[in-house]
A protein has these predicted regions:
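Conserved AMP-binding/adenylation subdomain of ANL enzymes
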Residues: 108-132, 140-182, 196
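Short beta-strand->loop structural element characteristic of the AMP-binding/adenylate-forming
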Residues: 1-6, 13, 98-101, 135, ...
Length: 302
């Protein structure tokens, strides 16, 4: 397990009941350089006292692990498309959080589906210019994991990681340094951004798309975003179990319509009643999804 030292005391308590054999400890200043990193770590540990005492025998510091690995030789494992890639735990909206078993082919499929879906947008980026995507979402969330991180790798793009999107002034300061092309976010972040006085300190003229997920985007927020950037928020729908994107509004849409759009390529969706039968047009029902991005099942829950 790789863990921030701020939470190591919690890990220490539960470690004996797990099968974990290796612990890598990270500190907030590890990637900030020798002097700035040391200063940040001192403040976090001693001034703000954000690191409770702990004792984990055999734990290795992050920088030490990197140093050890720099001289090692990578032995690539034999990975097949049906091998498990991620146990993506759900938000627990229906009870206890469950581990969605996502295979390598599930994630690859969803990246390719999103690439095909967004081609009309990304194709408008000037030739030779690197696609720049903002990631103001936690990477442990499937939205950020696939749509931001994996999508940027597929595109050979630049991913701007925002550590704390609640700190809008700092986020705007960072975004103002870049030519932003794609802005994925949740409604609360879109709302906070467009209503903040520093929103226009960012040059949004290079924006080709804004995508909303995680929760419904409010119409008033979408309207204000369109007025200020000239680009609509394209809302989609997905969940941990579908890697995550299952549907979306067409990439060439010119306005927000309040819907979750239509299924992605090679994806089928139905609305079913309590008996598992399709509901009539216009009636509410449970969404059933079939496609290459759908999980293999729930971990240890046959």
């Amino acid at each position: 397990i790789v863990i921030l030292e701020n939470f190591a005391s919690t890990l220490e308590k539960c470690l004996p009941a797990t099968a974990i054999r290796h612990v890598v400890l990270c500190a907030m200043g590890d990637q900030l350089g020798l002097f700035k990193g040391a200063l940040v770590n001192y403040v976090v540990r001693h001034s703000k006292k954000l690191v409770p005492s702990f004792h984990i025998p055999g734990a290795v510091r992050f920088n030490e692990a990197v140093a050890r690995g720099s001289s090692a030789t990578l032995s690539r494992p034999d990975i097949r498309s049906d091998d498990v890639a991620v146990l993506q735990y759900t938000g627990g909206t229906t009870g206890v959080s469950k581990g969605a078993v996502l295979l390598h082919r599930n994630l690859v499929a969803n990246v390719l589906q999103n690439e095909a879906w967004g081609a009309p947008l990304m194709g408008t980026i000037p030739r030779g210019e690197q696609a720049t995507i903002v990631c103001a979402l936690p990477l442990y969330h499937i939205f950020a994991f696939t749509y931001c991180m994996m999508q940027s790798m597929r595109l050979g793009g630049k991913l701007i990681l925002i550590a704390n999107p609640r700190d809008l002034p700092t986020m705007f300061q960072e975004l103002s340094k870049h030519r932003i092309h794609l802005m994925p976010a949740v409604n609360t972040l879109f709302n906070g951004m467009v209503n903040h006085p520093e929103f226009n300190t960012v040059d949004w003229s290079h924006l080709v798309g804004a995508t909303g997920g995680g929760s419904a985007v409010q119409g008033a927020v979408a309207k204000l975003w369109l007025e200020k950037t000239g680009r609509p928020i394209l809302e989609g729908y997905g969940l941990s179990e579908t890697s995550p994107v299952a549907s979306g509004n067409p990439a060439d849409a010119t306005d927000y319509n309040g819907s979750i759009g239509v299924p992605l390529p090679n994806t089928w969706m139905k609305l079913l009643d309590d008996d598992g039968k399709p509901v009539a047009q216009g009636q509410a029902g449970e969404i059933a999804i079939k496609g290459p991005q759908v999980m293999a099942g729930y971990w240890q829950r046959p």
